[in-house]
Amino acid sequence: MPHDKIVPEDEQYLFAHPEPGRSCYDTHADGTPVRYSSRRRPLFNVRPGFPNWLTGSYRHFPVDMYIIEWLEHVGIGYHVATDEDFEREGRALTDRYTTIVTGSHPEYWTRNGLDLLEGYLNAGGRIMYLGGNGFYWVTSQLRDKPWIIEVRRDNSGTRCWDAPYGERTHVATREAGGIWRSRGRAPNKMLGVGFASEGWSKGCGYRRLDASYHSPAASLFAGVNEAIVGDYGYVLGGAVGDEVDRFDIALGSPEHAYVLATSTGLGNEYQLVIEDLTLSLPDQGGAQRPDMVRSDLVLFAIDGGGWVFSVGSITYGGALAWNGCDNGLSRLTANVVHAFTGKGPVLGET
């Protein structure tokens, strides 16, 4: 029997009060997409410990707090920078740091932001991408009002609405909207992994691959005795879950990368992303297409001295914090951050 629909109090308030504004996932009353949003909008459901309606678990800001908790546990000093900080200060900001650690879901990036990160890596910077579905949508900021963003989904990617014909070019920057992959900048090229699947049932862990045992990168697994890491966590029960990214050479992932581990297997609640489908086909879930519906743990060097460590999963932070941060995944990630921030070579390279 169907269940009664229950609308949470915060959603009831937003239905009755239009003054807080809408997000870029909404449509207007006439059905047209909402293309602009602002960080000045009051957010009633974003705070530490607030469960997300989609998963019944944590998402976004609460998961980022697990990453902060983990950084403090392993004794790594950090500063927090926002999108506006990046846009305003550029390399003057990033060049002060050896390593940039992303949040759990860095989905919306501007062209300037991507250029900044690429320049930082090419100059020897290190990035730890500790999330999933990152660097996905073409995003613009208004020059005179940088707290406002513009998103035009351009009928591409896994999306919540379509941009009508004639309305797919950003007003702020006069560039085409859509996903960066369609613009020739798939995140695989810079981060080694890119969006592969989404689903909001139970997560899973990573199964270590040969590179984690028999390559220079094996040194990062010091203190990690498990063959499967991250099969635990405060978010969906595993380090791999929610929205996940895979290593894919066809999409630009570097051939020289160390693929250290891959997800142990997601269920059919996790479906292949739309941009990977050319036909409407059955059997595109995690159990039927583990070759595509997966998350990969990847490490690679950049010409010029830069390094990238990518995990390809939104729920990773919840596994880092598991058991008071005393677990194999936490030790692995701590080894990476110490290697990235230390004064010596990352893997003994000269």
Q: At which residue positions do the language-model features occur?
A:
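Generic signal for short, ordered secondary-structure residues
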Residues: 50, 96-99, 290
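Glycine-rich, aromatic-lined ligand/substrate-binding cores of catalytic
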Residues: 144-147, 152-335, 339-340
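A broadly tuned preference for mixed-charge, low-complexity surface segments
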Residues: 1-27, 123-128, 133-136, 150-163, ...
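Helical hinge/lid and interdomain linker segments adjacent to catalytic or ligand-binding clefts
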Residues: 56-143, 320, 348-349
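Aromatic-Pro/Gly-enriched surface loop or interdomain linker
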Residues: 1-93, 345-347
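Intrinsic-disorder/low-complexity accessory segments
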Residues: 1, 6, 60-66, 103-104, ...
